[in-house]
Amino acid sequence: MCLSYNRRNQRKKVVLMTIKKFSLLAIASLSLLSLAACDMDDKDDHMDNQPKTSQTSKKVKLSEDKAKSIALKDASVTEADAQMLSVTQDNEDGKAVYEIEFQNKDQEYSYTIDANSGDIVEKSSEPIND
């Protein structure tokens, strides 16, 4: 009687260990599949961003300093009087442009300058809210 009881316990242990192994294997497989699916999505995101970066770094005829001086001259502001001056190169409607923003006294100015011709594409000024 004791011998058959021990055999039953051993069989139960073997069955339980087998179930645990298969459960662990199933969980590991599902985790691996979900991570692989996430990795595939990241590759697509990086590919979408790549052309945008190369488009904004096109060679241009106009320097940042020249674009800045065009905007400041149009606003009748000297560089010494301009505060929080920022110049960034961007791509707008397929054209390379400089986005220039600055403040003077109680006004905030925003200019878009064509990076090849030096033409003012867009400009605006508004009072600074306190």
Curated annotation (Swiss-Prot):
Pfam families: PepSY. It comes from the Bacteria. Residues 41-64 are annotated as: Disordered. InterPro entries: PepSY (IPR025711). This is Uncharacterized protein Spy1430. It comes from Streptococcus pyogenes serotype M6 (strain ATCC BAA-946 / MGAS10394).
